[in-house]
Amino acid sequence: QDTQKELKAAGFSTELQKATVAAIRKLVAKLDWSRSASEWNDYQKTSTYTDAEREIKAAFVAKALQGKEARLVFDLGGNDGTYSRVAANHADYVVCADGDDLVLDGLYRSLRQEGNRQILPAYLDLSDPSPGLGWRGRERAAFFDRGRPDAVLALALLHHLAITGNVPLAELVDWLAAIGGRLVVEFVDPTDPMADRLLANKPPGMHGDYRREVFERLLEARFDVVDRQEFPSGTRTLYHATPRR
């Protein structure tokens, strides 16, 4: 109350407050950005996928999700939201999580322009996700404690976490199982150009366990594999799997 009296005495009336807010709103509305480059902002153009393979991937995601009620889908490493949009046709809400803020900003802007509130772009370093914060870590829940997805997309993701992030395949599969929900996951073979580029920066033999047969064995130990689709290139495989109860 003392503060209100002081503001009133200084001539800071309700009309002045409204005018100040209007001026700030006008200033913020004028703010814009100059698109710059980031590691992944042109991934759809620079990746090694052919148009046919992109269509195969979109069709596989749609098939895995269609006809099954999904309240929430996590698209992990979702980049520009290409497959989040596919998932949104079969789900109430999709969280597109990625570690490239420029890519996510572009997605946010396009969604806002469309009036699309079904997809949420969320910045997240998957190798170091947001923990629980505040008093005893309970005031703001950790990212993966904020919702249990009915389905998870992990497309063109694991090779980055395994090779660049040095996370063992067994840990990655356990992590995906712990998140819960149906899984659509892509394994990129070490002979694939994108994986080979990452391995070129590592000592020979450092990621000897990063092989498709090892991944499939680990996946089948924690999930029931419903469907799989190998790309024409032979270096990438998609899997639709459900967690074992």
At which residue positions do the language-model features occur?
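Conserved SAM-binding loop of SAM-dependent methyltransferases across substrates and taxa
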Residues: 80-92
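A short, conserved alpha-helix within the catalytic core of class I
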Residues: 136, 160-176
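Conserved alpha-helix/loop element of class I SAM-dependent methyltransferases that forms part
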Residues: 52-71
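A conserved beta-strand element that flanks and buttresses the S-adenosyl-L-methionine
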Residues: 153
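Conserved SAM-binding motif I beta-strand of class I
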Residues: 93-98
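Conserved beta-strand signature within the Rossmann-like core of class I S-adenosyl-L-methionine
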Residues: 175-190
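S-adenosyl-L-methionine
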Residues: 106-146
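Conserved class I S-adenosyl-L-methionine
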Residues: 69-79
